[in-house]
Structures are given as structure tokens and as C-alpha cells.
């Protein structure tokens, strides 16, 4: 089945090398050499597609859950400056030096983030967390996939954002952060790299 799916849009493209739905070319290398290769299988049922975001704590991929038959987002714990990965490999390795304690502390925080966000269930403007697991010397959070445009990409294409538009983007973020803070949780990774603008 994986060979018939487009690794960008997850439509069934059949044996075509170029997806007739989105134009993605099968076998396209990841944008960064340390990203997982599209087509990689995680936990025996998540097919990794293209990376859709990268922040200080990790890489987010668009993936296909073969068990449920739905597109999900998978955030991989990949803390910048602490780990590396050879192109085409799945496992991460710690950079040299005394990074083990720092890595373990951040990994624990990453997994606690998954548990914390999962308690919000279907709260408006907060992405649902479905599951999390450890593999490949790192960890993964399985989340709801939100179809939209990254704020970073929007700003790069459109330039300056009009004040009314900015307020419409920022207001739901403020409301979501209020809900999170009310539970004693601090979101440490709010940035244009992980804010989606959706319809």
C-alpha cells in the first residue's frame, strides 16, 4: 500500500512516479539531510511523509496512519544542538560532549508535553494528541493533522500582515495559551514555525 501512496498528500497515486494530485515526485530527498526519509515506517503503522515543520525541540512530519486510514502529524523529538542523524537513517545519535543529561531532561519534558496536551481532548484551537512512543533513540508524538499554511511560510510569501489579519491569527493563539496556562502548563515553543493558519 505504501508504494501506491503519495508521500506528500497521501492520495493513492498508483504506480505513477509523479503524483497526479499534487505533483510530488516519488523519491524526492528530504529538505534537510537529518529529516526522516519519506516512506519510513514508524511503530509498524505510521508512514512518514514530508517534514512540515522544524523547531528547537523537534521535526514535525505529515504521516499516514495505516491502522486508522487517516493523515496525522508526527512530532519527532530532535533537539537542535544535541543530536544528529545520518542521511537515510532512522536512529538519532547524541553529539559529542556531555549532552546525555541535557538530552534526557529535554526528552522527559517532551513526553510530559504530550501527556499535558492530550488532556485537552477536543479543545478548540489546541491540536489533539492521540498517542506517543519512544523509538530510534528518540520519541514521537502522534497528533491531529491540521491542513493549513505555516505562519512562517505565509509571512515569507505575503510579507507584512495587516493588523486585522494579525489579530485574527493571534486571538485564537492567546485563547489556547490561556487554557493551557490555566492547567499550569507553559508552552515553550510558540513560533511562526509551528503556528498553522487554516480555513
Model-predicted segments: where are they?
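Protein kinase glycine-rich loop
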Residues: 49-55, 60
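Conserved N-lobe loop of protein kinases adjacent to the ATP-binding glycine-rich P-loop
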Residues: 64-72, 78-82
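AlphaC helix of the eukaryotic protein kinase fold
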Residues: 86-119
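Conserved short submotifs of the Hanks-type protein kinase catalytic core
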Residues: 136-150, 154
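Activation segment signature within eukaryotic-like protein kinase domains
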Residues: 169-170
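Protein kinase catalytic-loop region centered on the HRD/HxD motif
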Residues: 173-185
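Activation-loop N-terminal segment of eukaryotic-like protein kinases
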Residues: 197-199
Amino acid at each position: 500500500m505504501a508504494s501506491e501512496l503519495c508521500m506528500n498528500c497521501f492520495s493513492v497515486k498508483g504506480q505513477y512516479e509523479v503524483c497526479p494530485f499534487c505533483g510530488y515526485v516519488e523519491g524526492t530527498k528530504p529538505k534537510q539531510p537529518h529529516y526522516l526519509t519519506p516512506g519510513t515506517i514508524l511503530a509498524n503503522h505510521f508512514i512518514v511523509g514530508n517534514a512540515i515543520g522544524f523547531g528547537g525541540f523537534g521535526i514535525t512530519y505529515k504521516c499516514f496512519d495505516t491502522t486508522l486510514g487517516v493523515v496525522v502529524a508526527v512530532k519527532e523529538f530532535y533537539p537542535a544542538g544535541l543530536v544528529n542523524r545520518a542521511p537515510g537513517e532512522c536512529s538519532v545519535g547524541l553529539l559529542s560532549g556531555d549532552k546525555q543529561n541535557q538530552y534526557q531532561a529535554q526528552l522527559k519534558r517532551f513526553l510530559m508535553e504530550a501527556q499535558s496536551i492530550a488532556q485537552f481532548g477536543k479543545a478548540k484551537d489546541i491540536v489533539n494528541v492521540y498517542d506517543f512512543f519512544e523509538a530510534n533513540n528518540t520519541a514521537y508524538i502522534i497528533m491531529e493533522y491540521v491542513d493549513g499554511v505555516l505562519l512562517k511560510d505565509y509571512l515569507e510569501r505575503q510579507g507584512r500582515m495587516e493588523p486585522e489579519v494579525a489579530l485574527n491569527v493571534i486571538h485564537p493563539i492567546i485563547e489556547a495559551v490561556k487554557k493551557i496556562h490555566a492547567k499550569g502548563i507553559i508552552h515553550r515553543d510558540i513560533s511562526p514555525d509551528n503556528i498553522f493558519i487554516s480555513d
